[in-house]
Amino acid sequence: MDLELFKKIFKYNERSAIPMENRVKVERIDENNYDRIFAISDLHGQYDLFLKLLEKIELKREDLLLILGDICDRGKKSYEIYMKCMKMIKLGYNLKFILGNHEDMLLEDFENDYPLNYETEYSIYKNSKYFEKKNIEKWHKENFYAEVKWLIKWLKDCPLIVCGNENIFVHAGLDLSKNLENQERENVLWTREEFWMDKKNTLEEYKNKNIYFGHTPNLDGKISKKSDKIYDIDCGAFFTHSLGCMEVKNKKSKGIREIYVHC
């Protein structure tokens, strides 16, 4: 059968070769819609650092804040950060959250009822002071799922990649030999490969864009420039007590800027 006829009959496209569970949700944005754009990653329960950063950058409703995954685990105020993010969204702030591998594990726990064992490593209440105020066993039986239903729904709707006019944001990394829609889920969530080194197979669409990722912590507490246009912005907040932020757009000035807060 002629390939073009095959495509028309079966509505074939490249994505159909990718198993559903491995498909990556890509959200495309117009960066011209925002006055300033900020990116942070891997908060890991460091709620106080998050508040310090919001105060320092003086986020406005005309701006955009991207969080590149891994709000939860390690630190003691994971759930508080999620609640703060949702409150900001409801108040009209532009905040986009990209799924991290720790959120992916959290969702898997809920799919398999692992939260019923509240001592599991990634249980939402083991990593949040919010739930320490409750009688866990009693609360579990009465309204646990009702209380966190909003969070699970929100996380399920989050993209794994956000692509703008000049910038790409992802949690762990990319395969630069594949376009965004053909990235593998496990790779964008988990990779620690030095993907920026594969210059020979890099597609043209990546050559003129900055790429920002997290997942692999910089234990000196600083943002790391991996190549001309690729940055690791995970400053290891839980370990270093330092949170780095990249201002990737400011309509009043040119270039990018690193911003830090400490506690």
Regions found by a protein language model. Name each.
Residues 188-261:
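Conserved beta-sheet core of the metallophosphoesterase superfamily
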Residues 39, 65-67, 97-98, 168, ...:
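Residue-level marker for buried hydrophobic side chains located in beta-strands
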Residues 141-221:
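His/acidic metal-ligating clusters that form di-metal
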Residues 36-44, 167-173, 231-233:
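Active-site-proximal beta-strand elements of phosphoester/diester hydrolases
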Residues 2-84:
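N-terminal active-site segment of His-dependent metallophosphoesterases
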Residues 44-49, 73-76, 102-107, 176-177, ...:
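Active-site environment of divalent metal-dependent phosphoester hydrolases
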Residues 42, 70, 85, 100-101, ...:
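Divalent metal-coordination and catalytic microenvironments
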Residues 74-163, 191-198:
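Active-site neighborhood of divalent metal-dependent phosphoester bond hydrolases
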